[in-house]
Amino acid sequence: SMLMVMGTSTCYQMMHRNKIAFDGVCAIVRDGMIPGLEAYESGQPAVGDTFAWFADNMLPQQYQQAADEGMSVLAYMDRLCGQLKAGESGLVALDWFNGNRSVLMNYGLRGVIAGLSLASRPEEIYRSLIEATAFGARRIFDSYTQAGVGIEKVYAAGGLARKSPVTMQIYADILNRPITATSISNSSSLGAAVCAAVA
């Protein structure tokens, strides 16, 4: 099973009986999570940060009406982009706005949004950024599968997993598998507390 801890960045963690080194894995640690198993870790350096950058820098004033409706700007954008079909806008993006951790491990790479026109709307750009991060996740999943480290189930924790059903559905569609999101609001803090309690 793969765990995606989704927040400002996304950390991918899973355990496997065997150590299989392959491109795109940031670390493999024996007994790193559970004694007797190899703990694998990969990641994307900017996921929630990309969405926040977009909301802070790219939205025209009329989209700030979300505050008048009592919701965050990103929740408002989720609502708008949830009404769009996949590929409807023709926009394509690469999620390298803070470089690439997995699988290329090159922090000098930069993000791209292609297909923009004078008719491109903010919600279309926002959806292209969500899709870009989801395809980045797909590339990570594919590297595990191609190396023989199978992924049977997918779990998601962190702020994005709880706050954005639209993002989670886009990820599930692009990964072509269901995702189970935790209902715990601060799962990382809870996990740290459990580890401290049993140490």
Give the positions of each predicted feature.
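Active-site core segments that coordinate phosphate-bearing ligands/cofactors
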Residues: 1-199
